[in-house]
């Protein structure tokens, strides 16, 4: 049975008096259980600010998975990892389980101006 995750096209905008930030993700990533999933997100703001990753399962609120580029939130399995290089951040899920099926969102911005 194939495992698929649907990533809604993400367009996060912050409009202020000084700047406008935009982050983009691919629409979807599909892998089989046991494989490695890599989900990328890109945007100019990532070169200057941390990236956070959220997981949202159907009917549930989003939950923080990775913060400050690569820090795992307490209780998140070690299979989840994050990295950022230049203007691209990547969420990697190793040894994917069917329970990992969800929407994943990247967010970034400084403390005063999140995007």
Swiss-Prot record:
Disulfide bonds join 41-106. Residues 71-106 are annotated as: Framework-3. This is Immunoglobulin lambda variable 3-22. Residues 42-50 are annotated as: Complementarity-determining-1. Residues 1-20 form the signal peptide. Residues 51-67 are annotated as: Framework-2. Keywords: Adaptive immunity, Cell membrane, Disulfide bond, Glycoprotein, Immunity, Immunoglobulin, Immunoglobulin domain, Membrane, Secreted, Signal. Gene3D superfamilies: Immunoglobulins. SMART domains: IG, IGv. Residues 20-41 are annotated as: Framework-1. It comes from Homo sapiens. Glycans are attached at residue 87. Residues 21-115 form the Ig-like domain. Immunoglobulins are composed of two identical heavy chains and two identical light chains; disulfide-linked. The keyword Nucleotide-binding does not apply. Its main location: secreted. Coiled coil: none annotated. V region of the variable domain of immunoglobulin light chains that participates in the antigen recognition. Immunoglobulins, also known as antibodies, are membrane-bound or secreted glycoproteins produced by B lymphocytes. In the recognition phase of humoral immunity, the membrane-bound immunoglobulins serve as receptors which, upon binding of a specific antigen, trigger the clonal expansion and differentiation of B lymphocytes into immunoglobulins-secreting plasma cells. Residues 107-115 are annotated as: Complementarity-determining-3. One of its GO terms (cellular component) is plasma membrane. PROSITE patterns: IG_LIKE. It is found in: Secreted; Cell membrane. It comes from the Eukaryota. One of its GO terms (biological process) is immune response. It holds the Pfam family V-set. SUPFAM superfamilies: Immunoglobulin (SSF48726).
